[in-house]
């Protein structure tokens, strides 16, 4: 069954063992997407969408009720539904990330909408599954449960004794175990890989991703979540593989390196066939006009240059924070574990008896005291696989990092 809205002859697919029409749920393939006149006509006297022709009702700039900083937003056409496609944003993203064009890009309300939509279009409730590699981002399992699909777990390398990736191989992807799980369970439709990992901070080598993409027993799609990719080396992104693999989808966001978490803009880069399916299935007008305006500005050459400058500053701060945390080793703070390619670090709190064992109870006390008494909120990750006793610390400003180190020193002595 052809994908509505796609000219397949323009977009050949490979590898040979992949057929997207066998991955997408039949009811989604047959879906006739919601369409409106605005899809075809966006100028002139617009009387097609039952909008308020008199405009919004927020008081004018002369009113004391108006916050001055809202004026740029209020000057937008807020009484009109936003663009269904946002091609100018996609074009800037295509140029930034080196993909073919807007036809290879989907925009969602944060990456979470993208992840949820991928599950909904590919995985049949009650009968089919996704595969995840703990410890990893928690929303994969949440989306799976919401959509009533199964979850197969293949933990990352937890011993730290072998494999590529983080410290001494810790949190490496166990490719052979992933392939084994695929071969044993053909109901697995999607594989979610987080690179750099959350909470691990570890990159998955492109060679490992390629090995799974080329594994003929797997007929589904590999999703590489790259929320933190700008904090890693430029050549680390799996976007470079898209031209060769129609069974790959790479997700990114403006929340991390771009510093725009509040606008909720997530991105999927994939073969045009999958992008068209997502476009056919998404809610109409999912990206708001204010979000689109801010995203367009954030992707300008000057803004991208500033983003890269701030990323460089954060990377330097990450190194400084790590040195400060290492100095706390005599107080019972273990060396950072995992990789060093995100805007956070993860450190284990060790038992006070000097045994060197990670201590979840002590870590929990420090976490809670930091938040409730010291005004410093970090993330307790001690219940994740391979993360016993661990606290995840986002890289803050220089002043914030100094406070974190001081408070950690005080609490490690006291607790």
Stretches with model-predicted labels:
Residues 2-85, 173, 187:
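N-terminal "arm"/small-domain region of PLP-dependent enzymes with the aminotransferase-like
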Residues 76-217, 228-245, 249:
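Conserved core of the PLP fold type I
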Residues 207, 359, 372-373, 383-415:
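PLP-dependent enzyme catalytic core of the Aspartate aminotransferase-like
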Residues 251, 335-340, 380-383:
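Short beta-strand
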Residues 315, 328-373, 395-397:
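Conserved PLP-binding catalytic core of the aspartate aminotransferase-like
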């Amino acid at each position: 069954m052809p994908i509505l809205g796609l000219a397949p002859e323009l977009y050949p697919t490979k590898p040979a063992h992949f057929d997207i029409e066998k991955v997408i749920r039949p009811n989604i393939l047959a879906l006739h997407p919601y369409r409106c006149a605005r899809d075809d006509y966006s100028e002139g006297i617009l009387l097609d969408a039952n909008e308020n022709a008199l405009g919004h009702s927020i008081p004018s700039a002369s009113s004391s009720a108006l916050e001055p900083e809202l004026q740029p937003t209020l000057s937008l056409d807020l009484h009109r539904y936003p663009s269904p496609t946002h091609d100018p944003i996609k074009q800037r993203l295509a140029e930034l990330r080196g993909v073919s064009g807007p036809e290879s890009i989907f925009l969602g309300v944060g990456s979470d909408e993208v992840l949820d939509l991928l599950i909904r279009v590919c995985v049949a409730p009650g009968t089919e599954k996704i595969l995840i590699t703990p410890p990893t981002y928690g929303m994969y399992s949440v989306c799976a449960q919401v959509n009533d699909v199964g979850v197969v777990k293949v933990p990352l390398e937890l011993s730290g004794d072998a494999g590529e990736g983080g410290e001494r191989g810790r949190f490496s992807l166990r490719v052979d175990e992933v392939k084994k799980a695929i071969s044993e369970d053909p109901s697995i439709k999607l594989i979610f890989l987080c690179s750099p990992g959350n909470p691990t901070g570890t990159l998955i080598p492109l060679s490992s991703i390629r090995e799974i993409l080329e594994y003929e027993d797997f007929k589904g799609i590999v999703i590489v979540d790259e929320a933190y990719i700008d904090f890693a080396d430029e050549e680390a992104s799996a976007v470079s593989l898209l031209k060769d693999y129609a069974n790959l989808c790479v997700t990114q966001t403006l929340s991390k390196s771009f510093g725009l978490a509040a606008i909720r803009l997530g991105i999927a880069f994939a073969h045009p066939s999958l992008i068209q399916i997502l476009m056919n299935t998404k809610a109409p007008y999912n990206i708001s006009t204010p979000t689109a305006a801010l995203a367009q500005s954030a992707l300008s050459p000057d803004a991208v240059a500033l983003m890269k400058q701030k990323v460089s500053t954060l990377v330097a701060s990450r190194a400084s924070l790590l040195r400060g945390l290492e100095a706390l080793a005599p107080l019972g703070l273990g060396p950072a574990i995992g990789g060093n390619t995100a805007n956070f670090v993860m450190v284990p709190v060790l038992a006070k008896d000097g045994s060197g064992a990670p201590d979840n109870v002590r870590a929990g006390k420090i976490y809670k005291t930091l938040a409730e008494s010291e005004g410093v909120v970090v993330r307790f990750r001690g219940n994740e696989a391979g993360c016993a006793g661990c606290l995840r610390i986002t890289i803050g400003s220089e002043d914030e990092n100094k406070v974190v180190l001081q408070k950690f020193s005080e609490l490690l002595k006291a607790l």
